């Protein structure tokens, strides 16, 4: 993530599937993005406005996903989402990716965080295991049965 341009990424996949159009490839690539209901944005806004926690986004993503999200959500909604976070870390911009430990160390060190006082939510076991080994508290959320808005009612986190 972030080590090649978006066009190089698309061309690499197209070399394996030459019959697929670039548009069809991009649509297929973006189809993996999950729905983001507005009540989650409300939750994030209230969490950010409480000023009780420092909130960061750390995402393995590329420009195709971000461009699609911005286009689909619209600039206003995307801006509202992004403004909930103190810092917005995207793998394609920082040239690091989960689950490599250097991405977690980068965020911890760049923001002078204490791992034991840091809470990381992710839906991928690999990512939470590595973060936990660094002393970070984790919640491997199951997107099929759990919702981040239930963070305070379901987890010992206050």
Predicted regions and their residues:
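Active-site phosphate/pyrophosphate- and oxyanion-stabilizing loops and adjacent acidic/basic residues
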Residues: 11, 45, 105
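Short phosphate-engaging motifs
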Residues: 39, 65, 127
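Short, acidic loop-to-helix structural element flanking the phosphoryl-transfer center
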Residues: 15, 23-59, 101, 145
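A short secondary-structure junction motif
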Residues: 1-5, 66-72
């Amino acid at each position: 993530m972030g080590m090649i341009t978006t066009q190089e990424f698309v061309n690499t996949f197209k070399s394996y599937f030459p019959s697929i159009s670039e548009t069809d490839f991009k649509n297929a690539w973006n189809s993996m993005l999950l729905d983001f209901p507005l009540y989650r944005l409300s939750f994030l806004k209230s969490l950010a406005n409480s000023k009780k926690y420092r909130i960061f986004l750390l995402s393995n993503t590329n420009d195709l996903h971000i461009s699609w999200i911005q286009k689909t959500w619209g600039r206003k909604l995307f801006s509202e989402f992004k403004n909930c976070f103190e810092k917005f870390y995207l793998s394609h911009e920082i040239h690091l990716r989960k689950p490599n430990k250097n991405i977690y160390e980068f965020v911890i060190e760049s923001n002078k965080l204490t791992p034991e006082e840091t809470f990381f939510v992710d839906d991928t076991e690999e990512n939470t295991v590595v973060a936990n080994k660094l002393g970070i508290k984790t919640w491997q959320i199951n997107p099929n049965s759990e919702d981040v808005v239930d963070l305070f009612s379901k987890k010992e986190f206050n």
